Curated annotation (Swiss-Prot):
Protein source organism: Janthinobacterium sp. (strain Marseille) (Minibacterium massiliensis)
Gene Ontology molecular function terms on file: translation release factor activity, codon specific
Gene3D superfamilies per record: 3.30.160.20, 3.30.70.1660, 6.10.140.1950
CC terms in the record's Gene Ontology section: cytoplasm
Gene: prfA
Chief localization: cytoplasm
Protein name: Peptide chain release factor 1
UniProt KW Protein biosynthesis keyword: yes
Length: 360
């Protein structure tokens, strides 16, 4: 293991010892915010330091076994011990490297999922509806909640644009690599000649900001317009100006929300989406710089990139970033995304490990 990594692990071991002392003090709970912060840090460091203890024990076993090599009766046993300990150390070093990777601070956050129909007209709108169902089913499998924030329905079904809020621990960590262009190849229901059409949608996954204030939105930078909601009709439609459109003048970002009958609730929802979009712009700029350094395709934040193709006649899904093809499209469209999300996370982790190795 590289000296820089050993030094880091020694430092974290000392920090855990320090936390043990601090948490045992009588006045540890006098400041509950600080106490919770320390307990979280303790919980994160515990498994890492335990693993490092196993690594040091394996190193110690090698030293002990090497001392027996000069004894003819113990030489064979010592060689076996050294080989076994070296194998353990190699695996432990890999595990320690993974645990030392910086944690994405947004991983545990709720998200806003935005799907926009692109090229392909009605078929693209229908596919946007299919994608929303796919992600909704995945959310259900993870026992997350889904809230409709904004929708622009298509006349033939599906959506021209739809935004939902997904509430659940780790939602961003599992879906953050879904942003980008999603292409579908299939025969539309209206196609009489049986020809395959190609359509596309753009997906954006945006971590929810803790508070709107976190993103530092200046009220003077906002233009807020109200208008009458449009919808399927009924006694509550078009009676009041309940729909809200917010424009963030510096960035040109526009958010509309009309799904609630209350203008106040629509404004609150629109502000949350606006905060998430501004945070997302900042995050993508950062990801783009980091990805360029790593020459990475995953997590680059590039929405224009076509990341995936769904081919219905062949029953396959291909993720172009990692050259992964799965022939279980029906299951995937029903929300079975675990194999895919795990593969993307593993590849991203491998890129981070490679970058960590270069840095050391």
């Amino acid at each position: 293991m590289k000296p820089s990594m050993l030094a880091k692990l020694d430092q974290l071991t000392e920090r855990l010892d320090e936390l043990n002392v601090l948490l045992m003090q009588e006045d540890a709970t006098s400041n509950m915010d600080n106490y919770r912060k320390m307990t979280r840090e303790h919980a994160e460091l515990g498994p890492l330091v335990a693993l490092y203890g196993n690594y040091r024990q394996a190193d110690s076993d090698i030293q002990d076994a090497q001392g027996m090599l000069s004894d003819p009766d113990m030489k064979e046993f010592a060689q076996e011990e050294i080989a076994a300990a070296k194998t353990r150390m190699e695996q432990l070093e890999i595990d320690l490297q993974k645990m030392l990777l910086p944690k994405d601070p947004n991983d545990d956050r709720n998200i806003f999922l935005e799907i926009r129909a692109g090229t392909g007209g009605d078929e693209a709108a229908l596919f946007a509806g299919d994608l929303l169902r796919m992600y909704s089913r995945f959310a259900e499998r993870n026992r997350w909640q889904i809230e409709m924030v904004s929708e622009s329905a298509s006349e033939v079904g599906g959506y021209k644009e739809v935004i939902v809020r997904i509430i659940g621990f780790g939602a961003y960590s599992k879906l953050k690599f879904e942003s980008g262009g999603h292409r579908v190849q299939r025969v539309p229901a209206t196609e009489t000649q049986g020809r395959i059409h190609t359509s596309a949608c753009t997906v954006a996954i945006m971590p929810e900001a803790d508070e709107v204030e976190d993103v530092n939105i200046n009220p003077a930078d906002l233009r807020i317009d109200t208008y009458r909601a449009s919808g399927a009709g009924g006694q509550h439609i078009n009676k009041t100006d309940s729909a809200v459109r917010i424009t963030h003048i510096p960035t040109g970002i526009v958010v509309e929300c009309q799904d609630d009958r209350s203008q106040h609730k629509n404004k609150a929802s629109a502000l949350k989406v606006l905060a998430a979009r501004i945070k997302d712009v900042q995050l993508r700029e950062q990801q783009s710089k980091e990805a360029a350094t790593r020459k990475s395709l995953i997590g680059s934040g590039d929405r224009s990139e076509r990341i995936r193709t769904y081919n219905f006649p062949q029953g396959r899904m291909t993720d172009h970033r990692i050259n992964l093809t799965l022939y279980k499209l029906d299951f995937i469209m029903d929300g079975d995304l675990t194999e895919l999300t795990n593969a993307l996370a593993a590849e991203h982790q491998a890129e981070l490990l490679a970058a960590l190795g270069d840095a050391n």
